[in-house]
Amino acid sequence: MAEIIALDDVHDAGILIKKILSKKGHNVHTFTEEEEAISYARTNKVDLAILDIKLKKMSGIDVLAQMKKALPAIRAIMLTGYPTVETAREAISLGANEYCIKPIDKDELEEKVSKVLRG
């Protein structure tokens, strides 16, 4: 199916995303460090990036902007535990296709991943 990156500064959140989406047949690569995820996206095929907005060194929106430079066609879903209209607007304006509110809901994540990958 799809090659997916999951970037969250909380290791368990990445593991949860991997468990949910691997059952749907996707290959999920989890990261807790922004630079590692960006580097991976530059050198590997990635269909979808699932990025937490609040990270350690930079925001998920900054990470998305860097990934878009390397892979303009990459699709993205932003994760946030602090949803605001501003954050949603900024994420969408930078090319995020969707966003999910944490804690992650399995059905919502599966539905949004499916929708974004269909284009």
Describe each PLM feature range.
Residues 11-29, 116:
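Two-component/phosphorelay signaling modules centered on CheY-like receiver
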Residues 33, 59-62:
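Acidic catalytic/metal-coordinating carboxylates
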Residues 86, 104-113:
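C-terminal output helix
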